[in-house]
Curated annotation (Swiss-Prot):
Family affiliation: Belongs to the plectrovirus ORF10 family.
InterPro entries recorded: Phage_1-C74_Orf10
Protein's recorded name: Uncharacterized protein ORF10
Domain of life of the organism encoding this protein: Viruses
Record key words, sorted: Host membrane, Membrane, Transmembrane, Transmembrane helix
Its membrane topology: Multi-pass membrane protein
Source species of the chain: Spiroplasma virus SpV1-R8A2 B (SpV1)
């Protein structure tokens, strides 16, 4: 059972941190600490969720015009 929790934790970490820290550092030439990297990833997820919400809002708004 403990092994399942470890696998689940690793899965969520893999999904949440979908951009590898070394890739971010090589693309941007930044030298990030772990805390800065986590803050950056939280910001990326906030932007992704906002854009998803905005896209869905626009779709429902456009569909509402045709009713």
């Amino acid at each position: 059972m403990q092994n399942d929790w470890i696998k689940l934790k690793e899965f969520f970490i893999y999904i949440f941190l979908f951009i590898d820290k070394t890739n971010v550092e090589s693309i941007t030439m930044w030298n990030l600490t772990q805390n800065e990297y986590l803050t950056l990833m939280v910001g990326v997820w906030i932007v992704i969720l906002f854009l998803t919400w905005f896209l869905l809002w626009m779709v429902f708004k456009i569909v509402g015009y045709f009713k």
